[in-house]
């Protein structure tokens, strides 16, 4: 027969290959049997499993028979089919014809083998106790009316088992995580499944909120019998789209596979429920020119009610794919799955804690669970609970597990110390002088001492590792006993339940308790096997780059003296520094409004008085680097259309996929200082965008994605009213009343900004012109920066009062602020020092003292042994 199914063709090729490699002259039915048994998912093997045949026993018998086959000398004729194999194929051909099939498949071969008297199959067949007629009935039932009318038809039989995973079987075997909470959603799913029509629930929710977990929870309830009568003994299958599509080479093959799955569900007569995760992938899947996509194949079965289906997808994909197809949408009943509250998320983590403790062999504290939920909610804003909190716990536990398997730091340090001593000892041995003899003896004593300490540390390490490993094994055993108890209760084996519940489990729990106490009572532990909130904070810091640590005493002290820290960089602006410091303190202790940004400030004042410098100082103080400041020069946003630069271009315009500069920056670095420089130069459309940010702490970009801005500090600088401010300060001298200063610039502010914009600003901070004393302090700050750069080259720099007086007089202009001072230092000091360095007049190890001589900066050089 020329027409073989793909599986049989492949088996025949392997049989010929096997005979060739084994140097056999003939390809016998045993070669074919061996190649058929090598594919446990084939129809041939599936039928044998259904009649409870022992595949392992048959494989061993075939291997023995093949070893007894005579071999030929290499280089002789190619192996040819034996007469017995030809007769077997002829018998299989007759079976196919009698069943009305066009292609010879694995079940036809099995029927032919069953009627054969050839060994070893004939002997093995007697162990099965099934007649050929009963076998044929089983195959007919298995086929569910399908005929072998294409080469791939055999693969598509039992499509449900091949392309789906049985969740209820996994639940019965204890391979699913417990599903905590979500009772309302599971109850709603059961309610929809129990309807007469439109009984297909669609779980819709953001990624990571637990849609798949609801399907797993339903499978667990079915196994436990905690479902209505209409759902008892049902099987929940999850469709594997990857397996369904993979390897579908020819047109129509994908549709054929999907139809086989649907046929399997329909043939179960309501006993099977199909769960399709990421159901939107079905829309368009498999569609080519003239072919239907998978969704269209589902519609008739969904409409008739023969397909019981649960779908799961995200809200965006539902709107993009499902809602567009009204015929598909109406066949599903939406169930919205929302993100759990913080309390519910902690409750979910408590239920999962034991699974992760057993897997990683660590202990997870209650504080770690709370920290995982709170910190992930606060700092990881682009993902959803409980998924992100579970990931934190998992990664923190894996970190501890990795440390347990690695060399502890004290042992590593001792080994390094020992290596250094041995190297030193070898160097001393090379010296033959008697003076070194005593030092060599001392070195040997030190090496012996370190070796003893190292041996003691290694012994402690091995003991601790043994205790931790033993504890993990006991917890694994406890989990197995609890699963066995549930299984015994399901099968009504109450003697076994009593033995487990009142004897074995309490005994093992007591052993675990004693082992934990023994581990906790050890002094000077080398290994940490506990996941706590500090470790969770460390993982969050690794993920986000934000220094998330519990507030230490050192940080508390730093926050209390925040004004002094800022005044080291920004001089003469007490109003601004005090207001900003108060805002940061409130945010750090958690008393600021959680629904708004950390702070929104408008810095007003003339140029060069420290507005931008204060923003840089804040970024360095809060996030340890000036680069944490995101700066926008608002002169680039003077046109109406330039607002798209901030939030992204609208659909259809160039740059739509790239996103906006503000939205993308805040998405990647939600903890930042955002500076809008010269805000008054921006177009009014920009202010409308800022209203939403300042009020709700949310920015919606052009793709309708919400960006969390609640952890950013927003600072705007402006020169509005700077002339009025300067005139007022000149007239009044020392300024002590901030409100009086603001009343001077209020009219100018109202001309530029709308009332609703001004109303959303936390504080408007006037920056007053600098005084002579302020300029002297700034000279000191700028000169210290130059001195620090020279100190890196081992050069000490000092200066006298004459230089300070010269720079403060020549470098300050009330119209330009302190910026000319920086230029003057660059011209008069830095340029002169750089020339001296290039000439070799100044070298590392020298001290340079700057002074003035007839309005010229000069320096004295002397050797500086201290540097």
From Swiss-Prot:
ATP 1 binds at residues 205-212. It is found in: Cytoplasm. It comes from the Bacteria. This is Chaperone protein ClpB. Residues 555-769 are annotated as: NBD2. PROSITE patterns: CLP_R, CLPAB_1, CLPAB_2. One of its GO terms (cellular component) is cytoplasm. It comes from Chlamydia trachomatis serovar D (strain ATCC VR-885 / DSM 19411 / UW-3/Cx).
